[in-house]
Amino acid sequence: MYIFSLFLLVILAIIGYGIAVDRKEYTVLDKAKDTAARQRFYRKWVATSWLFYGLPSIVGLLILSKMGVDISLPEVGVNLVPAAVSVSVIVLLLTVVTLVQAKRASANDRKKVQQEINQVSGGSIIARNSSERRLAAVLSLSAGINEELFFRAFLPVVIIGLIGSDLAILAIVISVVIFGAVHLYQGLRGIMLTGIIGVVMMVVYLATGSIFWPIILHIIMDIRSTVVISYLAYGNK
């Protein structure tokens, strides 16, 4: 149907714009020295997350549903429940362990983590103080909801609508690759890491049949990365 072609054009435009703009904005964030500038960045990314990923996904999925299109992903013929449970437990354990480390960290421990943050690709997005942590938590919540709706629920359905359900696996792979590619601003390591995260989220979605669970897992992972690790590095600052 023509609607899938139209949606794909919209999706490609959003992705192209996002790659170009995110890279520029992340460069600005990387150079930002004052917390006011960093907080403006968080607020802007929260807004753009809803505008470019959340809203189009919700509207698109509602339209397709009203048209009678099955917006769930087809069965892949493999029991993914054990894998989904395993990765979920690992993520939860890592988050708890990091939180415990943050509470027990010494001044030297925090300095070491700060040095690692400054060296790692994507480290600039980690909050530096309590004010930034609050905004980073909101950004994590927004990213978890909107990116999962866009890359796990909306994008694969549109691709399947164009190439057919027989090639559903290909559509799923393409959506995971695109999810990694939009994180170009984080460098090659960031692309590979987010690509792996995309695989994990897709496994959870396929195993549960509900977008709710990958959203929750995504939020937890992002909060660990931007908020809990920030607490580990900077304490109650």
Model-derived segments and spans:
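Alpha-helical transmembrane segments in multi-pass membrane proteins
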Residues: 1-90
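Transmembrane helix-loop-helix hairpins at the membrane interface
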Residues: 11-15, 122-237
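Hydrophobic membrane-targeting alpha-helices
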Residues: 18-23, 62-63, 67, 96, ...
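Residue-identity detector for threonine
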Residues: 27, 35, 48, 95-98, ...
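Short helix-coil transition/hinge motifs at the ends and kinks of transmembrane helices
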Residues: 30-35, 111-112, 162-169
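Juxtamembrane helix-loop-helix connectors linking adjacent transmembrane helices
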Residues: 62-142, 160-164, 235-237
